[in-house]
Amino acid sequence: MIKEFKEFIARGNVIDLAVGVIIGSAFTAIVKSLTDNLINPLIGIFLGKVDLSNLKFSIGDATFKYGSFLNAIINFFIVAIVVFILVKIINKVVKNEPEEPEEEEVDVSAQYLEEIRDLLKEQAKK
């Protein structure tokens, strides 16, 4: 069981996924800071409130806190744009890498037929 676990962990996909999750967590913190400390104050200048997360309205006893939702939407769009740009860059890099030509696997029977043909040609010359 330990051997299987080592093989599972050693596969590239698991390691790539782990790296992606760690980088994603760090990136989320950066985007949240960008939104909270730069974008929201800029939007707040026009709305008259710097902290969008406190935006809300009430209907009767119900309070709708839409400011946090706006923050989440802004965060989502920032992440989506960055991921889109990264995917475009990665696709461009992958396209520019020359592909190694794959060796054609010759069918064994075709190989035998070619050898027989060559032998028959040699016999015909004699």
Curated annotation (Swiss-Prot):
Q: Which residues cross the membrane?
A: 14-34, 67-87
Domain of life of the source: Bacteria
Q: What main location does UniProt list?
A: membrane
Membrane topology term: Multi-pass membrane protein
What is this protein for, i.e. what is its function? Answer: Channel that opens in response to stretch forces in the membrane lipid bilayer. May participate in the regulation of osmotic pressure changes within the cell.
The annotated subunit structure for this chain is:
Homopentamer.
Membership in a protein family: Belongs to the MscL family.
Protein name stated in the entry: Large-conductance mechanosensitive channel
Q: Which organism is it from?
A: Lactiplantibacillus plantarum (strain ATCC BAA-793 / NCIMB 8826 / WCFS1)
